[in-house]
Structure formats: structure tokens, C-alpha cells
Amino acid sequence: MVNFVSAGLFRCLPVSCPEDLLVEELVDGLLSLEEELKDKEEEEAVLDGLLSLEEESRGRLRRGPPGEKAPPRGETHRDRQRRAEEKRKRKKEREKEEEKQTAEYLKRKEEEKARRRRRAEKKAADVARRKQEEQERRERKWRQGAEKAKQHSARKEKMQELGIDGYTRQLEGEVESLEAERRKLLQEKEDLMGEVNYWQGRLEAMWLQ
């Protein structure tokens, strides 16, 4: 939604409506809630996976390795030690894998927190910058309007003082003065361009030698 405010004589300029900023803040809030919901779903999925691994590990410890039967007759002490060592090795590998998954999950969480923090800081900086720019724009419009009103009042007083004919002659004199100043500036520009061309020619001649 856009409103219009008066600036100077018979002019209306658009300004941002507070409802636009409110809608933008609501949209940003909904996006943040959606990201938090996705993070929670991911966290629940990882926790479910860890619990499943733990339950599977406990079941294997109770049942023994798949297909394992009663120790065969004549099994030596060294065989039992080797089997126990293999079990400990598998358990250690599972624990290492679980620790790796947990570390990766925590790392992703920290990275996401850092991204959200950077987005929040950037958003706050953008909001502050827009507010500052809006304030400066309003102050500039106010100064321009005040200056135009002052000039209009001065012209009106001068016209009343000199009359229509006198004020017209004064304006014509000002126009002639400005035209003379413009011609002077053009002549100075031509002189400078001529000097530049002169020195450029000198430099080119030196390079050719």
C-alpha cells in the first residue's frame, strides 16, 4: 500500500506505508519458524537412528552374532578369546560410527545457528539502514520544501515591491547575467581543451622520437 504526501507546491510523492514493513516482518518470522521446524525434524530423525542402532546392538549382544550356535566341542581358550576380541572390535567400531554421526549432527547444528545469526544481524542492519535512509529522505524533502517556500515568498515580496514590469526587467537582467557566465565557462573549457591537446601532441611527438 502506498500513501502520498505533499511536497512543495501541488506535488504529491509516494512514501512507504507502515503496513508494508509489518508484512515484511511477518514473512521473515514465518520463514524462521519453518527453518526451526525442519531443524527439529532432522534432530528427531538422527535421534531415532541412534536409538535404533543402540537397540540393534543390545539385541546382538544378547543373541550373539547371526547364525552363531553353541560353541563346538573341542573349542580352545584361544578361540574364545579371538571371538571375544572380534565382538569388542565390532562394538568399538559401532561406537565410533555413532560418535562420528553425533559430531556431524552437532556440527551441522552449529553451522545452521551461525547462518541464522548472520541472517538476523544482516536483517537488523538492513532495517536500521532503511530507517536511516527514510529519515534522511524526509529531512531532505522538508529542507527542499522549506527552501522552495522561502524562494516563493521572496519572489512574491519582490514582485509586490517592484511591480510586474519591474520584476520582469529584474528577471531578464538575471537571465542575461547567467547567460554571460555560461559563455565565460564555455570559453574557459575550450581554452583548457586546447591546452590539453597541445601537451598531448608534445608527448606524442616525444614518444615518436
UniProtKB/Swiss-Prot annotation:
It is found in: Host nucleus. GO terms for molecular function: DNA binding. The keyword DNA-binding applies. GO terms for cellular component: host cell nucleus. Keywords: DNA-binding, Host nucleus, Host-virus interaction. A motif (Nuclear localization signal 3) lies at residues 137-141. One of its GO terms (biological process) is viral process. Residues 70-87, 94-114, 122-160 have a biased composition (Basic and acidic residues). Residues 48-162 are annotated as: Disordered. The keyword Amino-acid biosynthesis does not apply. A motif (Nuclear localization signal 1) lies at residues 87-92. Contains three nuclear localization signals NLS-1 and NLS-2, corresponding to two regions rich in basic amino acids, and NLS-3 corresponding to its DNA-binding domain. Expressed from antisense transcripts. While mRNA expression levels of HBZ-SI were similar to those of HBZ, HBZ-SI seems slightly more expressed at the protein level ex vivo. Interacts with host ATF4; this interaction inhibits viral RNA transcriptional activation by preventing ATF4 binding to Tax-responsive elements. Interacts with host CREB1; this interaction inhibits host CREB1 transcriptional activity. Interacts with host JUN, JUNB and JUND. Interacts with host EP300. Contributes to the regulation of viral RNA transcription by interacting with host proteins involved in transcriptional activation such as ATF4, or CREB1, and by inhibiting their activity. Additionally, HBZ suppresses host NF-kappa-B-driven transcription mediated by host RELA as well as transcription of some classical NF-kappa-B target genes, including IL8, IL2RA, IRF4, VCAM1, and VEGFA. Belongs to the HTLV-1 HBZ protein family. This is HTLV-1 basic zipper factor. It comes from Human T-cell leukemia virus 1 (strain Japan ATK-1 subtype A) (HTLV-1).
